[in-house]
């Protein structure tokens, strides 16, 4: 569960770091949003370094959690209710993440 929580925080940092420039570029918000965006992306990169598995495995598994968090963001921030297919796809991605991260390994 600790790994999943770290993935959630990592995904949130990445989404915030990408959403703030989106607000500036697409919604005409202040250019100053780029400052917290850069900080959020730096935190995102640091958080990735805290994951205990090999980098390639972490990046592959992280993608599943990112999809889940992006769907939550769609609902919570954009105000768009996820479709059944959004939820099914997110669930499949989370199953993939669990297989990648928690499968038994000899190495």
UniProtKB/Swiss-Prot annotation:
Mostly located where?
Answer: membrane
Q: What is this protein called?
A: UPF0060 membrane protein PSHAa1175
What family name appears in the similarity comment? Belongs to the UPF0060 family.
Question: SUPFAM superfamilies from the xrefs?
Answer: Multidrug resistance efflux transporter EmrE
Q: Where in the cell is it found?
A: Cell inner membrane
Please tell me the species this chain comes from. Pseudoalteromonas translucida (strain TAC 125)
**Membrane topology term:** Multi-pass membrane protein
Reading the lineage from the top rank, the first entry is: Bacteria
| UniProt keyword annotation of Membrane present | yes
Q: Lineage in the entry?
A: Bacteria, Pseudomonadati, Pseudomonadota, Gammaproteobacteria, Alteromonadales
Q: Where does it sit, as one GO cellular component term?
A: plasma membrane
Positions of transmembrane segments? 3-23, 30-50, 60-80, 84-104
Q: Which UniProt keywords apply?
A: Cell inner membrane, Cell membrane, Membrane, Transmembrane, Transmembrane helix
